[in-house]
């Protein structure tokens, strides 16, 4: 039994139980703290503003001003 105790002690020292994530520690469970971060897509530099595209799914353009855009292949 002492070998099992030594093994358990070594395992707990190498990987303590406190290192395991608890459900309450997840950011998705704390919406109030997420809202206090105040990071939104309007202010965050990683999100760029994209202009509305007037091209259709297949790349064909129906409007004259859209034909001048790069997405139409002209």
Swiss-Prot record:
It comes from the Eukaryota. Keywords: Acetylcholine receptor inhibiting toxin, Amidation, Cleavage on pair of basic residues, Disulfide bond, Ion channel impairing toxin, Neurotoxin, Postsynaptic neurotoxin, Secreted, Signal, Toxin. Expressed by the venom duct. Disulfide bonds join 54-66, 55-71, 61-72. It is found in: Secreted. One of its GO terms (molecular function) is toxin activity. Negative results: does not show inhibitory effects against the mouse muscle subtype sodium channel Nav1.4/SCN4A. Psi-conotoxins act on postsynaptic membranes, and act as non-competitive antagonist of nicotinic acetylcholine receptors (nAChR). Reversibly inhibits both adult- and fetal-types nAChR. The inhibition potency against the adult- (alpha-1/beta-1/epsilon/delta) is higher than against the fetal-type (alpha-1/beta-1/gamma/delta). Induces flaccid paralysis in goldfish, but does not induce any remarkable behavior in mice and does not block action potential in directly stimulated frog muscle preparations. This is Psi-conotoxin PrIIIE.
